[in-house]
C-alpha cells in the first residue's frame, strides 16, 4: 500500500491530490493484490485507536477507525476480541485503567489485534499548563502528552514523549478540586547515545488558587552513569499529605553532558512521557 501511495503522490497533479479519495480507492487495489497472490503489509487493515484527553471531565475519549469503515469489535478488559465482542458505534469514555483491544472484521476475515493501555492516576486527563517550552522538534501534542495515560516505548519520535533541550520541565496541573496528595512522579527516557538523560532533581509546589504556591518536596538525583542501558525511568518524591488543587512539578534537566560523553559540556535532552500524582 505504501508503494501505491507513493505512486499516487508522484503521478497526481497537486490540485487533484486527495488522501480521502485515495483511501476510498484502496480497497479495490488491495483486492487485486490478494487475487494475484501479492505479498503486502497487512497492517493497513488494522484498527487505528485514537485516545484524546477530556481534561474538564477527567476522562479519556476513545475512537476507533479503519481506512475502509470496516466493522469494529473491541474489549476494554484485556480479553481477546472476536465477533461476539461489543460492536463499536460511537466514541467511548473511560476514567479508569483499561486495556483496549480491537479488531476489524471484513469478508476475508478479522484483522490483527490493535492494542493500547491507559493508566490512570490523579493527574491523568486533568488540565495541564506547560510553563517551559519543549524543543520545537519534540513538542508533538504538548502538555496533553504528559497526562494522557499512555506510556511510550524507546522511540522518542513516536509522539508519546515530549523533549526539553537544556531546559527544565515545569508544568502546572489543575486537579479541578482540592485533593489530598502525597507523592509525585515523572517518567523519563534514558538514551545517553542521543544525549537524552534523566532528571537530576524533582521539585513539587502546591496551591489552592493557582497563584500562590508553596514548596512541599525537593529531591536530587544523580547524573546518569556511563554504560546505562536505554530504558525508561520513573523518578518520584513523597511528602506529608497535603490538600491542594494546583500542583507545580519541576523536573530539572541534566545541566550539561558529563566528561565521559562524546559531546562533553553540551546541553542535554530531558524526555518525559507521563507525570503522576498520588
State each model region's role:
Residues 3:
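Conserved, mostly hydrophobic/aromatic
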Residues 94, 223-230:
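Short proline/glycine- and polar residue-rich coil/turn motifs
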Residues 129-138, 229-240:
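Short, surface-exposed secondary-structure junctions/capping segments
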Residues 133, 209, 221:
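Residues that form or immediately flank small-molecule/cofactor binding pockets and catalytic motifs
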Residues 215-225:
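Solvent-exposed serine/threonine-rich low-complexity stretches and specific carbohydrate-binding patches
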Amino acid at each position: 500500500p505504501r508503494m501505491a501511495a507513493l505512486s499516487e503522490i508522484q503521478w497526481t497533479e497537486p490540485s487533484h491530490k486527495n488522501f480521502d479519495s485515495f483511501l476510498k480507492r484502496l480497497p479495490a487495489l488491495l483486492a487485486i493484490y490478494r487475487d494475484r497472490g501479492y505479498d503486502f503489509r497487512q497492517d493497513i487493515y488494522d484498527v487505528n485507536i485514537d485516545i484524546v484527553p477530556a481534561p474538564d471531565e477527567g476522562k479519556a475519549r476513545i475512537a476507533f477507525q479503519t481506512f475502509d469503515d470496516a466493522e469494529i469489535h473491541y474489549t476494554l478488559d484485556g480479553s481477546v476480541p472476536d465477533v461476539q465482542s461489543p460492536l463499536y458505534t460511537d466514541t467511548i469514555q473511560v476514567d479508569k485503567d483499561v486495556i483496549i483491544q480491537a479488531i476489524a472484521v471484513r469478508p476475508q476475515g478479522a484483522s490483527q489485534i490493535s492494542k493500547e493501555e491507559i493508566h490512570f492516576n490523579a493527574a491523568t486527563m486533568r488540565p495541564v499548563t506547560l510553563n517551559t517550552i519543549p524543543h520545537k522538534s519534540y513538542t508533538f501534542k504538548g502538555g496533553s502528552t504528559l497526562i494522557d495515560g499512555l506510556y511510550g516505548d524507546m522511540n522518542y519520535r513516536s509522539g508519546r514523549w515530549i523533549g526539553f533541550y537544556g531546559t527544565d520541565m515545569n508544568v502546572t496541573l489543575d486537579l479541578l478540586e482540592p485533593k489530598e496528595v502525597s507523592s509525585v512522579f515523572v517518567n523519563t527516557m534514558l538514551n545517553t547515545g542521543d544525549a537524552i538523560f534523566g532528571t537530576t532533581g524533582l521539585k513539587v509546589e502546591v496551591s489552592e488558587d493557582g497563584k500562590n504556591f508553596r514548596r512541599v518536596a525537593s529531591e536530587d538525583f544523580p547524573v546518569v552513569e556511563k554504560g546505562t542501558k536505554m530504558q525508561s525511568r520513573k523518578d518520584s518524591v513523597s511528602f506529608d499529605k497535603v490538600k491542594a488543587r494546583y500542583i507545580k512539578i519541576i523536573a530539572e534537566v541534566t545541566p550539561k553532558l558529563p566528561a565521559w560523553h562524546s559531546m562533553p559540556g553540551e546541553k542535554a535532552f530531558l524526555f518525559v512521557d507521563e507525570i503522576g500524582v498520588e
